[in-house]
Amino acid sequence: MVQRQINWSLIDRVRAKNPIVLNLANLVTIDKVADAVSAVGASPIMSVEPAEADEMVMLANALSINLGTINEHQATQIRTVLRAATPLKPLVLDPVAVSAVPSRLKFAHSLLNDFHFDVIRGNASEIAALVEADNTSHGIDAGKVPNQVQIAETCARRYHSIVVLTGETDIITDGQVVYENPFSAEMLTMNVGSGDMLSSIIAAFLGITTNTWDACIVATVLVSAAGVLANRYSVGLGSWQVQFFDQLSIMDTKALLEFFDESEEDYLD
């Protein structure tokens, strides 16, 4: 359930502060990620050059590391950037498809062993792979992975990170406390890049607060609420994407709280 003590005003603070997010991006979704970061009021940097690492890290308020289209060049860039960023900047890891490709999983484990990430954001099969949990899901998208709360908690404790496990019900945990997002939009699961966008939006929120817990919850609920509202004004995936970016770009704290009040369930209990 949504708790009153969560600092929902972070939405307005992102727009006021305009944090810079350095994205080591999935090239399939790089434009969507840049647009999403911009829509919430932050400024995206989409650098691909290792030689720029020091300068880009100095400019950035937070970093999002995405393994979606990892290759040798990007692996070098990621390590170079992380060496420059640690421990100065908040870091988000998006371990795309580590459950499907052993080499990706090996690389993700090496990053997690060598660097500390404030947040790990992935679907159930990806998070399960990081902790070697048994699951029957294959491919990039998660299927019906059992014990998702337990898997997320295990991952959070192992890597001393907050885990945002996204899916039918989004789970956020620090290994002790668990928050389950009350909102879900089916189109978010159909839209390529929804997770990538969320990872970088979380980074945007980390760029303006040291409260990682609130940043993860507010960013995740914001994206879900925008998805639900987009459903109301769209007829298919194409028009939904337009409405989704519109909702992201106009939603502020007041609008989100009004959305809670309009909902059929009492989300604020």
Swiss-Prot record:
Enzyme class: transferase
InterPro entries: Hyethyz_kinase, Ribokinase-like
Top-rank lineage group of the source organism: Bacteria
Binding site for ATP: R121, T166
Pathway: Cofactor biosynthesis; thiamine diphosphate biosynthesis; 4-methyl-5-(2-phosphoethyl)-thiazole from 5-(2-hydroxyethyl)-4-methylthiazole: step 1/1
Residues annotated as binding substrate: M46, G193
GO molecular function, one term: hydroxyethylthiazole kinase activity
BP terms from Gene Ontology: thiamine biosynthetic process; thiamine diphosphate biosynthetic process
UniProt-listed Pfam families: HK
Cofactors that this protein relies on: Mg(2+)
UniProt EC number: 2.7.1.50
Protein keywords: ATP-binding, Kinase, Magnesium, Metal-binding, Nucleotide-binding, Thiamine biosynthesis, Transferase
Reactions this protein catalyses: 5-(2-hydroxyethyl)-4-methylthiazole + ATP = 4-methyl-5-(2-phosphooxyethyl)-thiazole + ADP + H(+)
Gene3D superfamilies from the UniProt entry: 3.40.1190.20
HAMAP family, per database record: Thz_kinase (MF_00228)
Known function: Catalyzes the phosphorylation of the hydroxyl group of 4-methyl-5-beta-hydroxyethylthiazole (THZ).
Protein family membership: Belongs to the Thz kinase family.
Protein name: Hydroxyethylthiazole kinase
Organism of origin: Limosilactobacillus reuteri (strain DSM 20016) (Lactobacillus reuteri)
